Each structure stands twice: as structure tokens, then as C-alpha cells.
Amino acid sequence: MPYQHLFLEIEDQVAVVTLNRPSKLNAISPDLHEEMMGVCRQLQEDEGVRVVIWTGAGRGFCSGVDLTTSRAQGEYQTRSERIDEYGWVGRQAIEIYRNLNKPTIAAINGVAAGAGMSLALACDMRVGSESSRFKTVFIERSLSPDSGMSFFLPRIVGASRAFDLVYTSRFVEADEAYRIGLLDRLVPAENLLDGAKDLARQIAFWPPVAIQMSKRVMQRGMESDLEEQLRYETHGIVFGRRAPHDVEEAAASFREKRPPKFTGE
């Protein structure tokens, strides 16, 4: 499927999605948003893709919603219409976090602000460099957090630190971002995408059904009590048996002291 506002590259079971509006620091317009939703659905159905990397073209990851677009400006009359108009902003978080049943990595080149920061937080992991910067920005627009930030940020950095970042709307530079957990890996800027790809290939090596179920189990664990989560873990183990070759291969390679070859079957 051709895209106008993003690039899609697939190699070695790893997909790289590059937001391509560099003149706008990859701000999310309605058209880009629709393509993000479409590429999520495409990658979900592609069994040859095991890990997805999100990044941005040019000098920024994503500066948030493009407020110059008519949809973002809000041409509506009633409160219900206003809610409908703003509702589209967060749907990419649902697609990436909930519906894209594959590990996701954000490679943060430059700034991730507002809904762009939320996009990064919706990914399972984040790789950055000394140029990476985060900014919640909503309070500066006389807005409360949206696009999933109020869900993701406290879970990643803790409640009080999340309040700090939202209330002050200050920039979080790369070193602090790494220290507080906004970034999981910090690499030289020239190696950013390679670093993300190295991480993706490490993940893609493992049995895909087990990886997919691990994502679901871990997500569920952030919202469940212990008893419910133990039941869901058991469900995950049973589900993983749907790939009998990989189950047998894991045991055989361990016995034979050789690297495993997982197929997803």
C-alpha cells in the first residue's frame, strides 16, 4: 500500500515506520493520522513482521498534532461535536498499544512533544540519543493531557514525576529521560536507528507467538490484580502452545546445546 506522509521499510522481520513531514517536525495531521492507522493494520496482518520501529524524518521525532489543520482547529458547534473532533487524536495510541500485537520501539530523533510524546510512550520501548528531548506541552495550549499521555506517563515514570512533567511543561533532555525511564537505551545520534534495529533483531530472534503473548500478559499486568493476572498468565502459556514447533524447538535446542530456529509454527 503506498503512503504519502510516511515511509515503510521491512527488512529481516523488522518494520521501520518513518513519519515523513519533516518541515512540520512530523506533526500529526489528519492525513498522517489515517496513514498511521492504516500501516498499523497492514503490519498487524503481516506475519513476516515481528517487530515495529517508529521514528521521524529530519530533525524531530514528532511535535504533536498539527494545529494548522482544519480538523485540529475544531470547526464544530456543539460539545458532542467537539468531543468527536478531538477524539481522533488518541486513536493511534490505541492502535499501537492495544491492537498492534507486536513489539514496538520508538527511535526518538530530536523532539517528541505533546501527542508525539504520547506516541513514543505508547511504544513498548524507547531508544534515544543525546539529541532526544521530551515535552508534554498540553498545559501551554490550555489543555489537559490527551492522546493517551495520562495513561502511559504515570505508568512509565511514576505519578509524582508525571505531575511534574505535565504541570511544568519543561523540556526533558536525553540524560534525564534515560535516568527516569522515558528512554530505555541511549546511543550516539549517528547510531540511533541502527541501535533500534539491533534491539528489534534481538527480539525478532525469539518465538513470535511467545513474544506476542508476553506483550499482552505484561500489558494486562499493569491493570489487573494479582489473582486475575495469575489466571491470565496461565492463559498465555496455553495460548503459546499453539506454536508446537517452537515449543519443541526450544526444548531440543537446549538439550542439543545449539542456537534455536523459531518459525512461529
Report the location of each language-model feature.
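Crotonase-fold acyl-CoA enzyme core
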Residues: 30, 95-211, 244, 248, ...
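Hydrophobic alpha-helical membrane-association signature
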Residues: 32-35, 89, 192, 233
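Localized chelating/binding microdomains
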Residues: 82-87, 140, 144, 173, ...
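Terminal peptide-recognition signature
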Residues: 17, 21, 36, 54, ...
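Glycine- (often His-adjacent) and acidic-residue-rich active-site loop
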Residues: 56-96, 112, 142, 225
